[in-house]
Amino acid sequence: MAFLSACTSWRHVHNAGFTFITKFPFVRNVHKLSYHISPLSSRFSLADISVKENNHPNGPQLRLQTHFFHSSSPMHATKGFRFPKSSTPLTLPAVLSVASFANLLQIPTRRILRDLNRLGIKDVFPEYLITYEYSSLLAEEYGFDVQEAAAYSAPSPKSLNSKKDSGPLRPPVVTLMGHVDHGKTTLLDAFRKSTIASTEHGGITQKIGAFTVPFDKGSKFITFLDTPGHMAFEAMRKRGANIADIVVLVVAGDDGVKPQTVEAIKHIQSADVPVVVALTKSDRPGTPIHKIYEQLLNNGIQVEALGGETQIIPISAKTGKGIPELEAAILTLAEIMEIRASPRDPFQGWIVESSVTKGVGSSATVVVKRGTVKKGMYLVAGKSWCKVRSLVDVNKKSIKQVLPGQAAQVYGWKDLPIAGDLAYEVKSESEAKRILSDIYRQSNEQNFYELAESQNEQRVSALAAKKSGPAAIQEETSVSKSFNIIAKCEDTGSMEALSDYLKPLQFGKVKSRVLYTGVGPVTETDIERAETSDAIIISFGVSVPKATFRLAEKHNVKLLFHNVIYHLMDDVRKLFALRLPPILVQRVTGEAIISAIFDIKAKRAVVHVAGCRVTNGTIEKSHKIRLVRNDKIIWSGEIDSLKHLKEEVTSIKKGRECGILLKNFDEIVTGDKLQTFVEEYKPPDF
């Protein structure tokens, strides 16, 4: 195609791989174009040409569209073949094989393979998967009118925050963020007058908790979100920042700004939400407050003490010091922001957490941003929909509705929604199903593109290996090992964090592969799937009955159960290391220093015997030995003779002296170090 405009530059990319650029003088009528196009026609076949006049502030401009092909090998010219004509537009899928594409267009497969080669796509074959980008290009060249189906666009997270709300003030949604073990959950205990922190596994938060707390004798409310501080839960912290109206950044006075604090600050800045800093453990003597001010400033947060706008409030959650001041700071900031929402608007909110409860089904913790959630409403979130069956507050009490700024547990989901999904109201079940159908189509198209790329690489690699013979195939299969994993978790947030940690595991060409993740207990199907695929099973936060452990043992399947993320990570790393090809290592068993050299007459020559003192371990005659000089290994071999005084011995322990005759080597000097060692295989350090 080509375009003629006032810039007088025409670029034509020939679809068979040929590119040229031609300068044209600016013309205002079609007749003058023939003078400039004629020279090209002698060298190329002109398939078609169309010229349109476009309106432009500087006067009408001509839009020139042409199809040129090499005259010696035109794209449209195939001897004895005519392209089919069709009056109806051709709808092409996101991905299809060359053979299917040829069958759909009723065009010989070999023709399409040749044209793909001319487009620069090499190593193609009938099973090769091509995307819509290339199939539509070829179809248009073959004379077909191609159309692409319009996809439904679901509301995005940005649409939730971009809308300017009206109506009464609503409770602010406040997220607590900070480094692990800096006191976030203990601070929430102080707000709720509860003891959450003492009941959490490993003393750390591993999912987002959401609940509404009354203040000023019930006249005001704040909805709090607690986020995990452990490094494995970055996605949860990012989600917490995106959902929040205000963030309370918790920094421990005795620890200062740490890695997860810095990461939390980046999420806060990315989400562009106001922040209040809570300085915990500030009642401890020697707290370097000014140093923490500087650390925060270096990461983009300027507190009021340094001339900025960010409040920093020293508190002690255990004694209650500073808690009223922190509450007042949050409520004052919320009043300044005028956070409003009408309960009469259509509902929109966030999925904070979701889980499956035995006997109850799928549920999700929802924070309402606008509108009201009531029983009987139809909701969509991500790839799931729900007819609200029941609503439960943080105290496990059934409620009739959830107002803006409040959080509650919503029951009735057909499938488990994913934490972080935008939830919104629809009018009916049929509308919910239609929306999900379009969402799945969009998702499948993206999956198809990824699948096409992956499968094409595998098929091309397999063909190359086949051409190279059995040795290449053996080599290819020997290095393509994977560490297969099936993971079951108590909720979607934990599942997300665990998947993010497991997927990047790699050492050399061995890498982890998460075959399946799900919410709920380990089932017999999971064990059978693990046995078939040589996978381990991880149960995180979901207790495993003894019968399930026995079943896994019967099927020779390794099953891990943990409530604490860092304990789980340690065990996964150990198991991953066992799947790696072992490496040969040398373990030193004894070490001696040469303090003197003795010349001994042998049968045909004089040999040098090392007079040594054993400084570490035991020198074993049967072990291999190496000579180290200036921290470099000079020689490695065997011991010919090991003597204590004049007696031949098999070993010499630390602290004793001996004479060592090396086999076929006597270039020794005083001060050299002799080390005996054994060679053994072990998993590589990971």
UniProtKB/Swiss-Prot annotation:
GO cellular component: cytoplasm; mitochondrial matrix; mitochondrion
One Gene Ontology term from the biological process aspect of the record: mitochondrial translational initiation
Domain tr-type G: 169-344
Chain positions covered by the region annotation G4: 280-283
Region ranges (G5): 316-318
Region (G1): 178-185
Superkingdom of this protein's organism: Eukaryota
Localization terms from the record: Mitochondrion
GO molecular function: GTP binding; GTPase activity; mitochondrial ribosome binding; RNA binding; translation initiation factor activity
UniProt keyword Cytoplasm, yes or no: no
InterPro entries membership: EF-G-like_DII (IPR053905), IF2_II (IPR044145), IF2_N (IPR006847), P-loop_NTPase (IPR027417), Small_GTP-bd (IPR005225), T_Tr_GTP-bd_dom (IPR000795), TF_IF2_bacterial-like (IPR000178), TIF_IF2 (IPR015760)
Residues engaged in binding GTP: 178-185, 226-230, 280-283
Region (G3): 226-229
Primary role: One of the essential components for the initiation of protein synthesis. Protects formylmethionyl-tRNA from spontaneous hydrolysis and promotes its binding to the 30S ribosomal subunits. Also involved in the hydrolysis of GTP during the formation of the 70S ribosomal complex.
Record protein name field: Translation initiation factor IF-2, mitochondrial
Organism per entry: Schizosaccharomyces pombe (strain 972 / ATCC 24843)
